[in-house]
Amino acid sequence: MKLFIILGALCTMMSVGTGAFGAHGLEGKLSDKYMSVWEKAVNYQMYHGLGLIIIGVISGTTSINVNWAGWLLFLGVVFFSGSLYILALTQIRILGAITPIGGLLFIAGWLMLIISTFKFVG
């Protein structure tokens, strides 16, 4: 599905931008702890953006389960990386409670991709 390729490309593009912003714009402004949080958000956004691109490439040849995998990964980026970006910038710790929701969405998305592979790929 072309949409997942676009969403994946946007996620990876934004992770390059947020990574550069963290390295140059936030240097010296955040503690080491919160810089680490920022970097984790950047890395997970990149990994799952690449996953979305892969899902976009293969989604036309498999089932609707692959589309579910794509949406779950995308929502995972929003919840996981989004909450970590906001946490790093605001240091409002309660936002860290949202992060595991994103992690669960990532796991569910990868699991859905595994299931669709077993189900529809010979």
Swiss-Prot record:
One Pfam annotation reads DUF423
Q: Mainly localized where?
A: membrane
- Topology in the lipid bilayer: Multi-pass membrane protein
Q: Which residues cross the membrane?
A: 3-23, 46-66, 69-89, 98-118
Alphabetized, the UniProt keywords read: Cell membrane, Membrane, Transmembrane, Transmembrane helix
InterPro entries, alphabetized:
DUF423 (IPR006696)
Q: Where in the cell is it found?
A: Cell membrane
The source's domain of life comes to Bacteria
Cellular component terms (Gene Ontology): plasma membrane
Family stated for the protein in its record: Belongs to the UPF0382 family.
Which named protein is this?
A: UPF0382 membrane protein SH2409
Q: Origin organism of this chain?
A: Staphylococcus haemolyticus (strain JCSC1435)
